[in-house]
Amino acid sequence: MEIMYRTARLAATVSALVAMSGLAAPAVEPTILNNLVTELLDLETPQTQAHRQYNFANPRAGWIFVSSAAAVRGAQSVKVILHTADGDVELAAHRDGRMAVHEAMRHLPAGEHTLSVHCEGGAALHGLVVRAIPEIVYPGLGYWTRQAMSRQSPYDWAFLKRIGIAENINVILERNFDASLDAVQWRQQGGKILTREGTHVMIKLRKESGQPFTADWAYEFLSGRPGLKRADRDGIMVSEFDGYGSQKDEYPALTEATQRLFSNPQFKGKVFNPYTVVLYRDEGGMAFVRELIKAGSKIVEERYLSEQPTEAEATALLSGWGIANLMKQYQKKMPDIQKHMIWNLGYMSAPPESLNTNPAVNYKVFMDMQLNCIANNPALAGLYGVMWYHSAYADEETLRWSAKLFRHYCIEGRRDMLGSDPYILPHIENPDFADGASGWNLSPATTGSMAVKHAAGYGRRQARYIGQSGAIENQGDYFLWTKRHADRPNTFSQPIKALEPGRLYSLKVITADYQELLSEKSTRAAHQLGIQIDNAVPAPRRSFQHVFGSDKLWLTYHFFVFRTKSDTATLTISDWVSDDHVYWPSEWGIQFNIEKWKKPGKTGGPVGRELMFSFIELQPYLED
């Protein structure tokens, strides 16, 4: 992916460098681009000399990004070599027929470093950029169990390469083995692999052993973890350690075990990165992480934030306790702790757990706002790393968007927002029926077959991350109820506004069976419905249904993608499967339990079934 070189520099004519061939160019003053990225070198004049060296100063032990641009023909070539204490590393080899831009990431110690560029056969180097960038972590490779909410699952390494994740991260958090990952190649090109561990496993094994939690026991447990023990892995990330007092008796033993662990040459270069939750509240916990930081490990602070009702409230959350003020609390305990911290944002966006809790808000914009705050707020200056948690709860559109956000903020060093869509979705009104039937045109099949109702706690059952991280309590408890009739459907509709002709949009709907909710006896089966959108063309290969369970209830998550032909349209949803509906999942090869009544022009399910409709979200869909 081509980095944004300055146009004037790319267009410059080839000219000879003033310095003699092979003379190293001195390191230049670094330029801070945002809180995450510092530019260490940007070639101003194309190199036509056969050999040239460039010095740069890495401001801290951490990741650097090197991008080189060259156009070569025939036998010409351009090579970029990094000189390290362990030997020379070829970062790029430009040859005829290869891409014009090569990129590489390497983890380097702080201090002076040198690149050598060799131009052969009259070739020229037209661009060379070196930047200090954050650690960018992808969690978690090999987490197969719940990646069912997409036609693209499983999210194996081959898929992640296709959607742009692989080229925009430098650390993989491994949950389970993935045969499509060439771990040797990944590490040879500079990437790292950490394995995921859980404190619940540590607690379970300790209880089974019947032994007290001592430094000896903790050391034996930790030293046996694959990420520390295996030579082809770079460490562990352990979930989780909190400041609520639940682990206060264990922190002294963990601190001593950590000291012993990293004084052992066997674990040189390894890391033990703990997931943390407001750990600044616990002095013993802070002593534990200070020991880890001293050994070169980082802490991974969890912050999973839900959408806010307005953009102003979202901004206040991020600049307040959601991100910036939380960091300030840590800094009171340890100044500059952000330089040893990976900020772990949540991008759960689909069942069984979702931070996309408000169908009136564009979740991709909220994701953009979070990284924008991290890139710009002074409290986060020099932050060591970032990650989104975690892929098993994210749909493939969100994964693709996260790659673009990483690129924008963590590699290009941008301060502006990546997207231009509004925070509040302008397309439909009252998508959660919180205002009754306002904005909707209800057409009941018969008297009393359709109404807006309420069920306490139903929003939580829809996988909304409610009651934590700024979420609105009781959001999603209202729904539209229909009772299926034998002779005609119940339908509800409203105009769709502010569409861009030719653009892709997604429509999400969550359904459940009302009587199953009341009886707490539920059957795992997809609910069938009819969706009609005029002036639109369906995109079936991007659409899917996902049946998920939540607290004794089976629900259906409907995800429908379409391309609009006009700036307005009409959305009609029915509890029948109509002849001309555009949502026909059985033709798309999705495997789920379709009810036997599903036929064109028929009810699509048993007469008398009481369906619950909620979370009617219509928003722009990321096309590439």
Model-assigned labels for residue ranges:
Residues 432-478:
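Extracellular glycan-recognition surfaces and repeat-rich motifs
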Residues 116-123, 573-582, 596-607:
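Short beta-strand-plus-loop segments that form exposed binding edges in beta-rich domains
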Residues 70-79, 121-124, 485-486, 499-501, ...:
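Extended, low-complexity, turn-rich repeat/linker tracts enriched in Gly/Pro/Ser/Thr and Asp/Glu
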Residues 60-70, 433, 490-523, 558-562, ...:
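Extra-cytoplasmic beta-strand recognition segments
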Residues 43-57, 98-104, 122-125, 481-502, ...:
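Short beta-strands within extracellular/lumenal beta-sheet-rich domains
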Residues 46-47, 85-109, 534-569, 574, ...:
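Extracellular carbohydrate recognition and processing domains
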Residues 76-88, 524-536:
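Short, surface-exposed beta-strand/strand-loop-strand elements in extracellular ectodomains
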Residues 58, 66-70, 74-76, 86, ...:
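Glycan-processing catalytic domains of CAZymes
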